[in-house]
Amino acid sequence: LGDVYKRQVSKIGENIGIAFQIKDDLFDYGKRKIGKPRGIDIKEKKLTLPLIYTLNEVDNRKRKWIINSIKNHNRDKSRIKEIISLVKETGGLEYAIEKMNYFHKIALEDLNKLPDNEFKSSLTEMINYVIQRDF
C-alpha cells in the first residue's frame, strides 16, 4: 500500500474513533438501554465532550459547583443527577451529537475517496454502525 493510502485509512480510523468515543460519552447521559449505568463517567471523574461543553456554557458559579461536585462529591447521586440535567439543559448532548455526526461524515467522505475494493462496503457499514449502536 502506498503512503497516501495508508495516511487516508489512518485518518478514517482516527475520525471514526472520535465519533465512537463521543457516542460512548453520550451513553452516560441517556436511558439505560446498555449495561453502562448513567453518570458512570462523572463518578469516575472523566470529562466527556457533553460535560466540557456545559462547563463552557454555564456561569462561573455553576462551573465551580460542577467541578467541585466531580472532584469531591462524585458518588453523590443527587449531584450526578443535577449535573446530567445541566448537561441536557445547556445543549451539551446536542453539541456532542453534532460533533459525532461531523466526524462520521468526514470518515465516510474520506472512505469514498479510496478506490473501490471488497472491504469498502464493510468499512462503510462499520462506520455507520458506530453512531447507530445502542450499547
Can you say where each PLM-predicted feature lies in the sequence?
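C-terminal charged capping/lid subdomain of soluble metabolic enzymes
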Residues: R61, S78, E82-F135
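Intrinsically disordered, low-complexity segments enriched in polar/charged small residues
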Residues: L26-D28, N68, E109
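Divalent-cation-assisted or electrostatically stabilized phosphate/pyrophosphate-binding catalytic cores
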Residues: R7-K11, R32-E57, R63-N101
